[in-house]
């Protein structure tokens, strides 16, 4: 008997005993190379432009399942057909990803000039820090056109890491706080637009202290509930420790916020140019950031993995050719 579930954690333990569903296979979401192969399959029946590259599309869709990738390809074909194109272009695939991830554009939603300036500086702050910090996720696209429930949207390229260091977490938090830091530095006031950013950094800082043991005052400790359930009325630490945790979380966030403001101040001219481009065109891409700040000084993990995979494929082909040659001689 075969069965599938995406919530194995809530199954009755009796179901998993020997002689029942005693053999389990965990199917993870496809990684970079697997997404590239899946795109290759779904692109075959579509008339695509020469600019479309399965590797590029795979890098733009981290966390997508096989069904999500099929949906992207179908949506891109529909967008191209609506615009009367003979071939599906790279732009159509990017618009398809945007629509699936962020929802429909809502150009009918009117924003004031002051709101547009605030959103542009906020998003340019994220983009600037993401480009300048080694471990932050680099920009793919930013728009100030309302999409879904949001007044603007940004897409970044997260690195699919197996492990994460303290420095990587700090860079991610610093880039996330770049939006609010830019508002304070440029406009002299802050807005509610950073609420989601603050939620993310608070969770990250809390995890660093409570789960990852990355706090200076509470090093190498992990406060967890061994039952696997959410904490109820009690927590596995004292009130004194709880206060110390709050202090450490606030300290980590303050350090990265000050760091974000410092980097933005040092790159004030570039950030200002980026915000102006965003106001003028309503959308910016990684090429625009590269034009202002230059190429990133670091190779991404995704690029490194692709290069390693190409080397492995080349070595496998070389070995296969040698075996075939040896068989031919015998």
Report residues per predicted region.
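Short pre-active-site segment immediately N-terminal to the catalytic Zn-binding motif
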Residues: 107-118
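Structural recognition of the conserved hydrophobic beta-strand(s) that form the central parallel beta-sheet
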Residues: 1-5
